[in-house]
Each structure stands twice: as structure tokens, then as C-alpha cells.
Amino acid sequence: MSKNKLSKGQQRRVNANHQRRLKTSKEKPDYDDNLFGEPDEGIVISRFGMHADVESADGDVHRCNIRRTIRSLVTGDRVVWRPGKPAAEGVNVKGIVEAVHERTSVLTRPDFYDGVKPIAANIDQIVIVSAILPELSLNIIDRYLVACETLQIEPIIVLNKIDLLDDEGMAFVNEQMDIYRNIGYRVLMVSSHTQDGLKPLAEALTGRISIFAGQSGVGKSSLLNALLGLQKEILTNDVSDNSGLGQHTTTAARLYHFPHGGDVIDSPGVREFGLWHLEPEQITQGFVEFHDYLGLCKYRDCKHDTDPGCAIREAVEEGKIAETRFENYHRILESMAQVKTRKNFSDTDD
């Protein structure tokens, strides 16, 4: 990881956090500053409890404690940390994370108990992995795309297992993927088994921090293992060889480096993005091809369904918007309403 010089704004934030920590430490003792060396730059490659693994500028990984004044720390955060000094009895003291730089982006997911929960930071792009088996679901792809648009993180759609397609199947799948190509999304067709299409994907990942999203069974872990060039798999397979059905993993989010350049954060928290915390207007904005027609409906409170004078529905009827996308839009709204109803019912039970 290259060592970046702090900007004036970043330095001010680090100093402000440090002063806030010093103020808090007067009220309640934190860690002894004499136990730690000089501040350095680093990136969080994994977080668990009150500890984090921080990679320094020279590529070494250090186990660190986290200052109590740091309110949020996730994999991908760029931090100021200090190494621990050797203790008198020869045991090394853990390092300490002192401050967190401002995030360029934050990947969040809704949580019934904690509201919106951050799971990764400074993501450049989300790689949406789908596959023809167990089944190709455009509805799930559309859910991921809405999440990406809401988070303002660039998506790439990757269709895996293309080696299982014959010519007729490939033509059909390409027709489905053209729906997304035509509205500006990048689509890559790959096979982690034969490694077809991996070179363009590797090029798209170079120099960027990515996170792979996909349901169990799409071959996400196999794809990551192929890209990482691992001799021994360190990412748990997300599909059972015997049944063909997906199985869950419980590992914490962790950042890995691609040999061709670029990084990936592997996290079990992005198998499926919940959208129930969003408002219907945010879902509408999440369909990029709707933008040209928003505000053109006859009624301001148009639900974009059977309402008379709906500009979006008319665009669908004229073939300007894909019917499958329009149908999935309403499926997402319906599923959101159902989840919110269950959540409200559960809250009243408490």
C-alpha cells in the first residue's frame, strides 16, 4: 500500500480527533501513550470487536486496539495508528488506532436493531455477481443496482458460469444483459471454472477497491479465489458441491490485494442488500432510466403504476423502458412494504 501524505483538511480532522481523545482521557483514562511509537498511516484490513488488523505503508499487518473516541471503524477505513512498543517482559504491546480519515464512500446495510450499519469504507465499485445457476434472477440484480445507486457507488454486473451455456442459451442471456448495457451499466461474462472472461474483469478491478456482492450459489468465492491466484483457498466456498445449493459463511469482512493490482473486501454482509429502510422515492431514483420521465406524469403523486397519465408507464408501453425492469420496480416496492409491515408489527409486540 502506498503511503499518502495527509492533506491540510485531513490533518485538521486527525488533530481534532486527537484533541477530543485527550479531552476524554482526562475524564476517563484510556491507553497509556508511552506504550506506543510514532503515528503512521494505515488501512484497516479487518475489524473484530474492539480490535482491528491494520496494514502499514510497508505492507506489514499489525493487531491494534481502538480508541474509545472512535465511533465507527470498518474494513477499508484509512487510519492513523501507532505501533506498540515491546513491554518490559519482552511481550509486544498491541498497536492503537488513533484516528480515522474521512471516508470517500461507505457501504451500509439496514439492521432491524441498529438502524443503518456500516460494513465497509472507501469502496470504489460493487461487483454484482450473478449466474445462470441456480437461476438467473434479474430481480436480484435490480435490487443490487438500486442499492448501488442509493449509495452512489459504481456497479459492475458480472455473470458467472457462462461455460454451462450452449449457443442458444448464450444468445438468450446476452439479450437479457442488453437491458443493462443499454442503460449504461457495464456487464462482463465470465467463468471461474474455465477462467474465460477473467482478464477483462481483472483489468476492471486494477487500481480500485471493490466489493463482491452476490447470493449463495453464484460462485462468488470461486471467482475471488481465481482472481486472487490463491494456491490454497482462504475464502470459504459459497456453494455445496453435492447439493448445488448455497451455504452461508460467517467470516468477518477482510481486505485482500489482487496480484494484478487493486483490492477487494470480502464480506458476508453483502450477500443481499436490504432496501426496506428506503423511501419509495429513493427506489424510483434507483432506476436510472426513469430519470428522464420523472416530473412528467399527469399527477404529482403518481405511483407509476395504473395511474392515468403516468409518463414512466407510457415509456414502458412505447418500449423505451424494459418491461422486466418496470415489473421488478414494483416487486421491490411491494417487498419493502411487506418488510416494513412485519417490522412495525414486531415493534408493537415489544
UniProtKB/Swiss-Prot annotation:
Its cofactor is Zn(2+). GO terms for cellular component: cytoplasm. Residues 1-33 are annotated as: Disordered. Gene3D superfamilies: Nucleic acid-binding proteins, P-loop containing nucleotide triphosphate hydrolases, Probable gtpase engc, domain 3. It holds the Pfam family RsgA_GTPase. It is found in: Cytoplasm. Residues 1-17 have a biased composition (Polar residues). This is Small ribosomal subunit biogenesis GTPase RsgA. It comes from Shigella flexneri.
